[in-house]
Amino acid sequence: MTIKTADIQFNADGTPIATNFDDVYFSSFDGAAETEYVFLHNNLLPQRWQQWSKPTFVIAETGFGTGLNLLVTLAVFKQHLAQHPASTFTLHYISTEKFPLTHTDLVQALNAFVQFEDDAKALIAQYPMPLDGCHRMSFLNNRVIVDLWLGDIHDSLPQWHTNENGLVDAWYLDGFAPSKNPQMWSPQLFEQMARLASNGCTFATFTAAGFVKRGLRDAGFEVEKRKGHGRKREMLAGIIARELETKVNRQQARYYQRGAYMNSTSVNTRCAENHAQTALASKPKVAIIGAGIAGASMAYAMAKKGYDCDIYFNDATPAQGASGNPQAGFYPQLNVDASHASQINAHSFVYAANQYRQLQSQGFHFAHQWCGVLQLGFKPALAERYAKLTESQLWPGELVRYVKPSEAAQLANCEMPYSGLFMPLGGWIDPAQLVDALFDAAAKLSQVRLYSHHALNGIEQKNVSITAQENTRWQLHFEASEATSGMNKNTSLAQADIVIYATGAQSHDIAALADFPLRMVRGQVEAVPTQTALSKLNTVLCHKGYLTPEYNGQHALGSTYVKNDLSTDYRLSEQDKNLATHYQSLSDCQWAQEVVGNAQGRAAVRCSSPDHLPLVGALADIEKQKKELSDLYKALPLSYYPKGSNMNNVFVLTGLGSRGLTTAPLMAEVLASQISGQPLPMANDLLNTLNPNRFLIRQLIRREV
């Protein structure tokens, strides 16, 4: 959903002032020094970082504002890395903002801090559009991960996923003064701070207001007054107390303040168990099954977190399934309501658009055209629906906007008598080249090995000897086949600590996925030859099908949807269907009627789910969960039910359907974060929507199993 941006004025000193709160964003005298003193030194960050042994240190902030606190933190963290080059932990910075600055105001505000010029440029380049939810950014070659949650803090914090060990190691309790912004400084905020706090979590804040001190103490923090910065006499700082009680309360209230759905069914809350994060070996061996867009995105996400990956796939080369089409449209599927599916699609698209552009800037090549996507209102009812979607202002204009026929014609560079929706960040991509680019990018960060002609027969867990120690590992069994020239030598057996199924349409051959209601859908795309009128097309057109601009003398026109058909042979009957759909949808465009087929194209099988959303998370042990959660239909209190059993360190990323280009990068990042124990870049509600065991839970509630 669209977030209202901040109303900003700049004073004579160039300091930004929030008109609605009548308060400055930072001190006009020395805002950077105040940030370093209040938040970094009073949280003892330099000292704690020297001794930190965990893989991640998490800072959480209650008001992002101009990003000054982040920039100061980056500067101090870089000093730490220079002085302690053996330090290996990742710094994770989570912040919230109800009224984000516009891009223009952010640039002007940060002009005052030339000492942070490089990091400020990196922030400005990644700064998100005003879209409600979590936006992930990275700095210092992935050593610092930033999650910026846009929206009301009282809505955001209950959606942060944590386990019984907590999430946050240090709080920056910032924001406008309590007297200016009393809605934020509430008991609910302090309770959430305590819920999310890890053992030893500290906090610091510039204010010394009495009700803030009392609220923090009531929530479970030890609080003390300390000397303030500059002209401010006092400030507050402290540490989480009552470790045992906090742990117990957090364990008993894992679904803290979940809203209306908590009383309706147990579907979402039980699904949340599949995002449990367990400790792994310091250097685990990772096996990814599948080498399409899901497998490549997974390898890249894991490589960014320092994992080496072995990729096993059936074919001679990667991207031979649905990811092998020469052209594919890239755009989000948005609705007139902010459903979970719409939110997932919107955030997935924004994340993917940023990632693909970053790959380009880093020198990884894949054919593409960021020409935008025009979704045509080729029927009156559709045109009306699209107009309502933009009139509601549900989605930011940077994401989608309504265009009249005249502008549509200008964007498409051809006759276009239809209004529609234009998505400027979209376009088309060569998926197979993108898959190669993702594997290449992953290989620059860690060790990535590709094993072709490896059709998985199954996995089993055994104790194996590793460096004179016994360790439980998965053994992967493959069908024997001949090695392919240029690829790694084939073996019939491999070992891994972590197994990730990113198997797409081949999921139907995986025994471990047999109990999941995956749907296989055949699709055929035409490669139609260009001609004079068609060659002018300058954007992707979507109607009941789609048509791309010219690439290598051809246009992609598609696509059919044939359920439960695993054949990939080319069919003239489906060519006729694709052409007929195109002619009918663009019946008022003469140039569109001149498009002809040439019996060239490609068919592949997509893997989808009944609710058209991916399956992302730990792989449920279906038979055990059927027994453990058999009483779900009774709708008893959550504390009654045990934690559902999952396969040990086995995960799944599949069911992307025809939206793999859009959803794969963020889904892979979510799963990689779960595996590595890092904060998850998605709200609990949305995580629950993606959980692989959601279908089983629904069946148990309905007593269908």
From Swiss-Prot:
Its main location: cytoplasm. It is found in: Cytoplasm. Transmembrane segments: none annotated. Its cofactor is FAD. One of its GO terms (biological process) is tRNA wobble base modification. Keywords: Cytoplasm, FAD, Flavoprotein, Methyltransferase, Multifunctional enzyme, Oxidoreductase, S-adenosyl-L-methionine, Transferase, tRNA processing. It catalyses: 5-aminomethyl-2-thiouridine(34) in tRNA + S-adenosyl-L-methionine = 5-methylaminomethyl-2-thiouridine(34) in tRNA + S-adenosyl-L-homocysteine + H(+). NCBIfam families: MnmC_Cterm, PRK01747.1-2, tRNA_MNMC2. In the N-terminal section; belongs to the methyltransferase superfamily. tRNA (mnm(5)s(2)U34)-methyltransferase family. This is tRNA 5-methylaminomethyl-2-thiouridine biosynthesis bifunctional protein MnmC. It comes from Pseudoalteromonas atlantica (strain T6c / ATCC BAA-1087).
